[in-house]
Amino acid sequence: VDVDFRQMNAESIDLPDASVDVVFSSMFLHELSLKSIGRVFAEIRRVLRPGGLMLHMELPPNTQMGAFEGFYLDWDCYYNAEPFYKAFRDQDPRELCRKAGFRDDHYLQFVVPSVWNHGEAAVETAIAAEGHEVNKATTGRLSHGGIEWFGFGAWREAQS
């Protein structure tokens, strides 16, 4: 697999239209304002080839967490200089993708365990599983059983 890692302004990606197969970010979006996220998603959609994948590992949305778990995760917004943290977690990831022009039926969401706590086999099993529900006790937070990571994204529609 030919992989090209680049660091640049995600709101103004210096690549031609429809030129990449995958755009991936990890723990990035919650550092941005909602306005910036919209611009980033639009840029990602622009540079993705038809059938390309946008994928983000992020914090789980508040709508999929219980009240205590939401409070626990949102603590950083108030006491750890994370000003966009809660506003991001209050969003519906599917709607963020839809607003950027991704089709609703091309949205994907998943939860995978930490490879460091559970090993590669557990991650592969989680990826292959049906239904990726957020575990209120372990997704996005440290716990006795390790941590699970929330991910979401969308495929750009293939040209017909």
For the regions a language model picked out, list residue spans one by one:
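Conserved SAM-binding strand-loop segment of SAM-dependent methyltransferases
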Residues: D2-S12
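C-terminal alpha-helical "lid/dimerization" subdomain adjacent to the S-adenosyl-L-methionine
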Residues: L55-G119
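A short SAM/SAH-binding and catalytic strip from SAM-dependent methyltransferases
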Residues: D21-K35
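Core SAM-dependent methyltransferase catalytic element
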Residues: R98-S160
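A short glycine-rich, Lys/Arg-flanked "PGG" loop and its adjoining helix->strand segment in the class I
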Residues: G38-P50
